[in-house]
Amino acid sequence: LALSLSLSMAGAVGVSGCSTSESRFESVPVQDFLVAEKELPQGFSSSPIRGNELSRATEGTQQPSRAECREPSKQWFSVASADNQAGEYLEYPAAEVVVALLLVRPAGSLTHIDRYIDLCQHYIRQGSGLTLGVSVKPYSVPDKTPGARAYQERIALSHNSAHGTVQDSTVSSTYLYGNVHGVGVIAILRSRKALPTAQQTASLNAIFAGQVEKISRTYG
């Protein structure tokens, strides 16, 4: 599955003229870098993420207990205009794969992600009657994505009731970040389990690596 994903998604948007390749690259709308229908591997479907949904596709509406633990993608999107943001959900129901692919120009700070991993290994998010205990650990970036950053969050869900705080379940989110010639690429895998399956992470890695390759080829 991972191989077919990477091959299927490695197509490029053509840009002509070597002398003006950079300026032409910068004129390509970020939504053009999303996965086209014809690039979807068998069994996958896609649906757009628009407007405020882009923010909710990251950490939702819960707020962190410490300011430095604001999910890094929030910072990336806060400095980009709406025209320079795009996203889509890529789903493979047979393997319970749901990946949010988000693009933003300009890309944000990768060092901010390093600080997040270092400083926010354990913290709390709260909001809408929910309490999320978050544990953060590094995650290995896929091959052929030099300079990328990655981490995995294990999230213990609980809610408030008349009898106090009730523990619900533990889920996970895995994040991949890349800066590809100024275009920020963020891929997020949600799993209903404490740890994603090998097939789920293989799909995430292939989607991210394929997107990095697609944008790099467009650049020239």
Predicted regions and their residues:
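Post-signal peptide N-terminal segment of mature Sec-exported envelope proteins
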Residues: S27-G43
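N-terminal export and membrane-targeting signals
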Residues: L1-L7
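Sec-exported extracytoplasmic/periplasmic mature domains
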Residues: V35, S45, P106-G108, R125, ...
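A short, solvent-exposed beta-edge/loop patch
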Residues: K137-Y219
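A small/polar (G/S/T-enriched), proline-flanked helix-loop surface module common
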Residues: F44-Y175
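C-terminal motif of bacterial Sec signal peptides marking the signal peptidase cleavage site
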Residues: G14-G17
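Solvent-exposed, polar/charged alpha-helical surfaces in well-ordered, non-transmembrane soluble domains
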Residues: K38, T111-D118, N205-A209, E213
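Bacterial signal peptide processing site
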Residues: S19-S21
